Amino acid sequence: MMKIEKSSQPKENRPYGLWPSPISPELISQAIRLQDLQWAGTGSTLVWSESHSGKGRLLAKPDGEAPYTLSGTLNVKAGIGYGGGEFSAGENCVIFAEKDGRLYRRSYGAGKPMPITPAFGCSAAPALSPDGKWVLFVHTYEDQDVLGFVDAVGNLWPEKLVSGADFYMQPVWSPKGKAIAWVEWDHPNMPWDGTRL
């Protein structure tokens, strides 16, 4: 049987929140927040987003190599609602949302991010097609959300695919790229109250 010894220290009562803590606001502000992890292509490269001091960046870690930054000096951040849906990792490239509202493409390895959408409104939740040629995304402009699509290299003007709902989120492609799905809902509902798939 284990013997438990009583402490010689007097018992101290303090109100909630007044105990000294090693966790300070300064420590929290220095933390790096990991936000999403995706395998690129055949699963040989891990891609993730992280946030530090309010700035988001996108990193890649190929198998057997050191991690490197994909986003350069850009601030990776989805600009719709509470954010989320910041990037889509494909076989040869990644598509990501930047704080300026545009979507950018970056090939793995050497290179720099290139915009694929114009600078108006805000974009989020990019979804790269299985063949890597098209991108679905959520876009908002003047308080109107739509589901849009654009070619993955930005040669064509983005087009509105679906509109009419108040909010859209999480567009995805079928495995063969022949169909798409998304979630939508209207005021006054929240996503957990009343959505359509």
Where are these regions (language model features)?
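Conserved beta-propeller blade repeats
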Residues: S29-T45, L74-C93, F120-V135, A165-I180
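Short, solvent-exposed loop/turn segments that connect beta-strands within catalytic domains
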Residues: G43, G154-N155, K178, M190-P191
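Short loop/turn segments that connect beta-strands within the blades of beta-propeller domains
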Residues: T42, G54, G90-E91, A97-D100, ...
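Multi-bladed beta-propeller domains
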Residues: K3-R33, P62-Y82, R106-C122, G148-M169, ...
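N-terminal presequences and immediately downstream first alpha-helices
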Residues: I4-Q9, W39, T45-V47
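Short N-terminal amphipathic alpha-helices
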Residues: V47-S71
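A flexible loop/linker signature enriched in serine peptidases of the S9 family
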Residues: E50-L58, N75-G81, I95-Y104, P118-S123, ...
